[in-house]
């Protein structure tokens, strides 16, 4: 996102938490070339495109970043949170989704420009990454990991 927004203007982003029936979650590691939070763990997500509904954006982002098609997975929209950065031109709403499905690792096709690895993590492993300050948005999305 390179566009600066005025105070009171927001853009829409989405996050897609993808879990397996065994209670583990797919998390990816950000490439070290990222300007912000390189090497941190995260879930798939990104900005909605012009004219795109939130639900369309999360399906697209998960597919682009992981290769997974979550259209027929259990779950869906969970909650929205707002982030404001006054004077920085970076205000946004985040729609958080959770999908649960069987995942065969051969179905994963990571977007190499964005990710440098993945793991299926337990909630405790995710909490440990967060405690180290290495899990993006954890405090805002932690309830999405409660199944």
Task: Tell me the role of every PLM-derived stretch.
Residues 43-76:
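The catalytic Nudix box helix
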Residues 32-34, 48-49:
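Short, catalytically relevant binding-site loops at active-site mouths
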Residues 9, 30-32, 38:
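Short, His- and charge-rich active-site/binding loops that engage polyanionic ligands
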Residues 1-2, 34, 39, 77-147:
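Nudix hydrolase/Nudix homology domain
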Residues 2-4, 31, 54:
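Residue-level structural signal for beta-strand termini and adjacent loop
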Residues 16, 44, 97-99:
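A structural signal for short, well-ordered beta-strand segments
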Residues 1-15, 21:
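Acidic, metal-coordinating catalytic segment for phosphate/diphosphate chemistry
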Residues 24-27:
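Hydrophobic "anchor" residues
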């Amino acid at each position: 996102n390179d566009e600066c927004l005025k105070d009171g203007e927001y853009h829409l982003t989405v996050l897609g938490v993808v879990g397996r029936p065994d209670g583990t979650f797919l998390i990816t590691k950000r490439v070290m070339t990222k300007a912000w939070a390189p090497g941190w763990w995260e879930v798939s997500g990104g900005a909605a495109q012009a004219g795109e509904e939130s639900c369309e954006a999360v399906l697209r982002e998960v597919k682009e970043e992981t290769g997974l098609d979550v259209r027929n997975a259990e779950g869906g929209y969970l909650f929205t949170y707002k982030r404001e950065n006054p004077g920085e031109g970076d205000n946004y709403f985040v729609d958080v989704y959770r999908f649960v499905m069987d995942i065969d690792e051969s179905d994963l096709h990571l977007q190499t420009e964005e990710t440098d690895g993945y793991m299926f993590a337990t909630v405790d492993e995710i909490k440990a990454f967060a405690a180290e300050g290495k899990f993006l948005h954890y405090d805002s999305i932690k309830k999405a990991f409660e199944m």
